[in-house]
């Protein structure tokens, strides 16, 4: 894991690994988490969700944590939010049986660490655990339209904080509102203020509009996968530079939510289509719109 929490390369891994072998330390967390821990120098940052022991109380906390990298000691623990609805007034129970509101991974620029949670809470702390700013994306831009709990991780790149919200355009399970738009959000990591918000259009339908992927920076562009297509955007404005796809011809499949993020290497962008569909290797350097036979011409395999 690295500062973005979405990828990493590391050597000197243990040859054998188990509960009592190849382990330097263990740490009990205050609650469950599906987020990737990130490492910055001597610190490890991760998020967690706690639940009340009283089932009738239905209350819980969204937790931000900082651990010592070498000992596993908890250096600080902060209550980042309470409840799961915008404003912190919701119940702490999961909306479904396979969700965790501590699924997005934190990010850090070495000066502050920023935590995002599935209810829309976005909170920045100093490396010492002092709160610097907070906002709630649902409260600012409308309720999320996802069947499961939203779990995309934010991205820090060149002093900008990016978050994709690729969602349905209609309510699902009483969540969200009609005509909701998918969008990309760019913020100042120093204060959380919006620098730009750009609609990200798609012809996908229903679940296929949803994506839990992370924005990936590459060669001066932002790569975004979801809504049946892969797109490249200008980091300064959010404007779409090119569009490739689709892995869902005619957008016939309505239940192809995308979960993995794109990856780049060797002059190719790899994007994984949903539900046993192929992995596409697309040549970098695209411009304009590539679909149908034209889109396949840019596919290496």
Residue locations for each model-derived region?
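Noncatalytic, solvent-exposed loop/strand surfaces
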Residues: 1-301
């Amino acid at each position: 894991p690295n500062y973005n929490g979405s990828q990493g390369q590391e050597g000197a891994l243990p040859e054998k690994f188990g509960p009592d072998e190849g382990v330097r330390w263990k740490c009990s967390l205050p609650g469950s988490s599906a987020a990737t821990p990130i490492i910055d120098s001597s610190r490890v940052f991760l998020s967690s969700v706690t639940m009340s022991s009283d089932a009738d109380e239905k209350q819980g906390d969204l937790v931000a944590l900082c651990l010592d990298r070498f000992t596993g000691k908890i250096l600080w623990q902060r209550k980042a939010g309470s409840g799961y609805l915008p404003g912190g007034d919701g119940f702490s129970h999961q909306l479904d049986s396979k969700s965790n509101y501590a699924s997005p991974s934190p990010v850090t620029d070495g000066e502050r660490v920023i935590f995002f949670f599935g209810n829309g809470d976005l909170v920045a702390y100093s490396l010492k655990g002092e709160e610097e700013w907070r906002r709630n994306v649902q409260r600012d831009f409308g309720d999320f339209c996802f069947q499961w709990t939203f779990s995309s991780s934010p991205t820090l790149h060149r002093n900008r904080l990016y978050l994709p919200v690729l969602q349905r355009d209609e309510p699902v399970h009483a969540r969200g509102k009609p005509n909701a738009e998918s969008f990309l959000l760019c913020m100042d990591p120093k204060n959380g203020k919006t620098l730009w918000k750009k609609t990200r259009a798609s012809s996908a339908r229903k679940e296929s509009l949803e994506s839990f992927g992370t924005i990936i920076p590459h060669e001066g562009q932002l790569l975004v996968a979801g809504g049946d297509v892969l797109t490249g955007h200008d980091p300064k404005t959010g404007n779409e530079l090119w569009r490739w796809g689709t892995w869902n011809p005619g957008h016939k499949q309505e239940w192809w939510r995308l979960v993995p993020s794109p990856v780049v290497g060797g002059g190719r962008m790899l994007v994984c289509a949903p539900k046993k569909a192929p992995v596409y290797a697309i040549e970098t350097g695209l411009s304009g719109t590539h679909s149908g036979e034209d889109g396949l011409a840019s596919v290496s395999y």
